[in-house]
């Protein structure tokens, strides 16, 4: 009897998890489209430093995760950043559906979440110098977690890189917010082994650089 009851509970939990996973999966694409619309509406109001358009492509929805590309197009370029009109920054995005994203479960985290995502910078004409500086490794990778209540957390991993006379080791930054509007944003981070080489005999070094800040918007 106990064994049958336990089996019934397991089956019920599996059904609930499966239903929750399916439902949260249906919310990903509408959420992406709303984020893009809000961003582009802000552009029309002149709230961005550069004339940029956000879009997405190749959306592929599965049961446990959704994959797509997010791209930022500099419509008129950014001369001060040596960015030509039409050049793009592209990100590969892999979203694991809640309420219990697989990766979080594998790390022993059983707190329900709307979604968890991995974001990687794509190597293209505009971003290639960053990959070269990082010795052909991904220069930055982000892991994001979105809670049902609106709070979010992001971990940004930075690869060691060398940009001419300036170099640094690996780094990691975390961003935690109360809601999607970025209010009360808690930022912590650290970059190792910073070097600024003025000449073969003259350089400035720092073992690490640390940030610990609470931003209220």
Explain the meaning of each model-derived region.
Residues 7-8, 18-217:
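Glycine-rich, small/hydroxylated-residue low-complexity segments
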Residues 1-13:
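N-terminal Sec-pathway targeting helices
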């Amino acid at each position: 009897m106990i064994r049958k009851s336990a089996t019934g509970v397991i089956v019920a939990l599996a059904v609930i998890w499966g239903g929750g996973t399916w439902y949260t999966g249906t919310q990903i694409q509408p959420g992406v489209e709303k984020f893009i619309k809000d961003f582009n509406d802000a552009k029309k109001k002149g709230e961005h430093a550069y004339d940029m358009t956000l879009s997405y492509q190749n959306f592929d929805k599965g049961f446990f995760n959704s994959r797509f590309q997010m791209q930022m197009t500099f419509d008129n370029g950014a001369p001060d950043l040596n960015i030509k009109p039409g050049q793009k920054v592209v990100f590969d995005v892999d979203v694991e559906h809640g309420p219990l994203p697989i990766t979080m479960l594998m790390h022993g985290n059983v707190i329900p979440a709307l979604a968890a995502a991995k974001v990687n910078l794509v190597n293209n004409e505009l971003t290639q110098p960053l990959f070269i500086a990082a010795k052909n490794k991904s220069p930055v990778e982000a892991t994001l977690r979105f809670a049902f209540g609106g709070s979010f957390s992001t971990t940004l991993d930075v690869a060691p890189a060398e940009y001419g006379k300036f170099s640094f080791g690996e780094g990691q930054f975390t961003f935690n917010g109360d809601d999607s509007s970025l209010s009360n944003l808690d930022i912590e981070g650290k970059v190792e082994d910073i070097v600024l080489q003025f000449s073969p005999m003259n350089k400035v070094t720092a073992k690490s650089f640390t940030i610990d800040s609470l931003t209220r918007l």
